[in-house]
Amino acid sequence: MDPSQNPNIVHATTIISVRRGGHVAVAGDGQVTLGHTVMKGNARKVRRLGREGQVLAGFAGAAADAFTLFELFEAKLDKHGQLTRAAVELAKDWRTERRLGKLEALLAVADKETSLIISGTGDVVEPEDGIIAIGSGGSYALSAARALLAHTQLDAKTIAAEAINIAGDICIYTNRNVVVEEL
């Protein structure tokens, strides 16, 4: 959905997850857009989840829906203790509970071994190349990260931050106020 189609819902962001050298980094921009207006430039859309902060997560989409998903996912993570199992259990609930079916958000989650996208339709997708990019600037950030991975020796954290910066130069719903978390 075009972020500007419903001016009453907070939309749009860019989140990327990159793996290199045994490290994983998740980065996100700080812009919150309501319709055609930038409401905030320093939102924190990336956080650590789990008892010991062993999972990194970022969200794109409607902010209230994303916070609901963060809470539900973290509860599954606390219960099952393993990223993939928690994601699958959340997806099962998403498909069976009517109230969850209307959530307009995506989650990008990663631990030391696995990166997953949890979609608004209850799908769980593991990217084949270990890179996740979601949100309005996702394809720009994905392209930048792939190029930087292929042609530089930069670490995962630097690549993730630079990919968000590049997306922020192109996508009007993304800014260059980057938050990065790394494992």
Curated annotation (Swiss-Prot):
UniProt xrefs under PROSITE patterns: PROTEASOME_BETA_2
Cell compartments where the protein resides: Cytoplasm
Chief site of localization: cytoplasm
Catalytic residues of the enzyme: T13
Keyword Metal-binding: yes
GO CC terms: HslUV protease complex; proteasome core complex
Activity regulation (UniProt): Allosterically activated by HslU binding.
Keywords (A to Z) from UniProt: Allosteric enzyme, Cytoplasm, Hydrolase, Metal-binding, Protease, Sodium, Threonine protease
InterPro entries recorded: ATP-dep_Prtase_HsIV_su, Ntn_hydrolases_N, Proteasome_sua/b, Proteasome_suB-type
Function statement: Protease subunit of a proteasome-like degradation complex believed to be a general protein degrading machinery.
UniProt protein name: ATP-dependent protease subunit HslV
Originating species: Xanthomonas axonopodis pv. citri (strain 306)
Name of the gene: hslV
